[in-house]
């Protein structure tokens, strides 16, 4: 009797999986942290939080002629490098507390790594070395929030409609693994799953929809399928914008993450991306 061949799109919990979440120092969301912790728990992996501090911001703060507007009074004042560094230190403390809280509930070990540089460059470099990477947006905030300001976004108010979870499925093994996790996250959050299928995908969109429903199993009942003209961030963004997005799941090779479109995406108030190898 032959041995049944494993589906490469199904998660292999026996192998070591590196789970990483890349966070912009001035702002990060609870959705990204919770999704990362949940994925780390499923794979029995440690969660690595990469906190990226804006190197350019620190350089600007050192210039003698740099000014900033006070958030409270609106007054123009000198930009203080010492205050910026102090605020960044406070943010690391906030992140550590947030990780302890989120990961403690799931009994997931975690660690924080801090780097300074360009957010997109550092995030993509780190993502290329991880089996699962969660990328949050690059904030437009010019300076870090004051030390006492709450950094984490709060949960939606009671009665507020939950934003759907999105997944790009093109038939590749990585996009299949991403789809399975997206379905699980959507089910656990009692929210809708929107599956984006590229119109230009090989084999045709109907075949992909059938394949996606098979992979989702019982979670296919909450799935809604949309067709995007091509597998690009811009096309996805146009589809997502009217409905909103909680998380976007995709395979690492489904979209070129090094393009200007990706950089623009990560600067928008959009949802975190979960990139799976």
Model feature map: region roles:
Residues 117-120, 228-234:
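Conserved active-site histidine-acidic residue motif and adjacent donor-binding/catalytic loop
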Residues 40, 103, 127, 186, ...:
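A generic structural signal for well-ordered alpha-helical segments
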Residues 76-86:
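Short glycine/proline- and acidic residue-enriched helix-loop micro-motifs
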Residues 2-78, 161-228, 235, 245, ...:
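Small/aliphatic-rich secondary-structure junction motif
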Residues 95, 99, 211-212, 261-265:
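A general structural detector for well-ordered alpha-helical segments in enzyme core domains, enriched
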Residues 110-112, 225:
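Hydrophobic/aromatic anchor residues within beta-strands of the central parallel beta-sheet
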Residues 84-102, 106-108:
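Ordered, amphipathic secondary-structure segments that act as subunit-interaction surfaces
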Residues 4-5, 15, 29, 33-35, ...:
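Gly/Ser-rich helix-loop-strand patches that form or flank binding pockets
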